[in-house]
């Protein structure tokens, strides 16, 4: 049974500036000797986990912060009815390796994702340890013997199970590290891009000349290739031994978000809220990106979208034949481009593609 789900998306963005660097310019990359506009994987992942769809279908995302004092206050508010304040503070101190007192500024060593439900479970263990007169070392030993019990709590923090978690201090270094089950590539345009510059003014209505500020902003449009894969076995392990069905359900939602969610940068100015034009999912025994379909930059032919889908389909056929791919595969497309090889099921709607993923690649 195939362990990896590969998700391929082609999405055409109208003029926009969805991801910028430290110089306030569009992020880019050289691929195939040509400049491509780029949207970082970090930007895509944040857009997904902060989306309304994520909240409605997966649940509350983790709290990512370096500011432990603020986290302490949030935990006191959310868990105060269940646990004594001293237990909450001690639990956070043990997990972070930092003294959590009444100081206003307490910083962790790095930005870390925290799950309220997971911390509540740790509070229960700390309270029980105090009742049993266990010191911190004995408590750590007891907890290390059943990591799976800890991982079950990540069902309330699926984004950590997907993207992973690094810990550099406290008990989290031994109990909280998670190898992410999902990999997301930086999205790049399928074609070369020469950006434009928007010259803009901020108008002062009370001044005769009108202008209060002059500025410039780089922007462009383009067809982007997005790619992600999910290691189903790793996801099951990260969720404390979840079933394959549970992992497939989460993968289904990732497919939806990768096809529909867009980073929010400059969106009040450009409103590039474009849905995906093509989504393909395939099951395989290894991660499999189709980015090399665009190593030779696509040339415009009545736009870039149609030739990009054609380039993808043709490259997929070559890879599938050359490597003998026989895992289930399905594609949803808004385009009238000739369909991909017959071995790839054609889905009329995104919802039908999601149902196919949910059913383990079966109609």
Swiss-Prot record:
Keywords: Antiviral defense, RNA-binding
UniProt key word RNA-binding: yes
GO BP terms in the entry: CRISPR-cas system; defense response to virus
Gene Ontology MF annotations: DNA/RNA hybrid binding; RNA binding
Domain of life per record: Bacteria
Stated induction or repression of this protein's expression: Repressed by H-NS, activated by LeuO. Activated by the BaeSR two-component regulatory system, possibly due to envelope stress. Part of the casABCDE-ygbT-ygbF operon.
GO cellular component: protein-containing complex
InterPro entries, per the entry: CRISPR-assoc_prot_CT1975
Deletion consequences: Loss of resistance to bacteriophage lambda infection, loss of plasmid silencing. Increased levels of 57 nucleotide crRNA and also 2 and 3 spacer-repeat units.
UniProt function note: CRISPR (clustered regularly interspaced short palindromic repeat), is an adaptive immune system that provides protection against mobile genetic elements (viruses, transposable elements and conjugative plasmids). CRISPR clusters contain sequences complementary to antecedent mobile elements and target invading nucleic acids. CRISPR clusters are transcribed and processed into CRISPR RNA (crRNA). A component of Cascade, which participates in CRISPR interference, the third stage of CRISPR immunity. Cascade binds both crRNA and in a sequence-specific manner negatively supercoiled dsDNA target. This leads to the formation of an R-loop in which the crRNA binds the target DNA, displacing the noncomplementary strand. Cas3 is recruited to Cascade, nicks target DNA and then unwinds and cleaves the target, leading to DNA degradation and invader neutralization. CasCDE alone is also able to form R-loops.
Quaternary structure, from the entry: Part of the Cascade ribonucleoprotein complex, with stoichiometry CasA(1),CasB(2),CasC(6),CasD(1),CasE(1)-crRNA(1). The 6 CasC subunits make a helical stack forming a groove in which the crRNA lies. Interacts directly with all of the Cas subunits. Stable subcomplexes of CasBCDE-crRNA and CasCDE-crRNA also form, both of which are able to bind target dsDNA, and at least CasCDE is able to form R-loops. CasCDE and CasCE complexes have endonuclease activity. Interacts with YgbT (Cas1). Binding of target ssRNA or dsDNA causes a conformational change in the Cascade complex.
UniProt name for this protein: CRISPR system Cascade subunit CasC
Protein's organism: Escherichia coli (strain K12)
Designated gene of the protein: casC
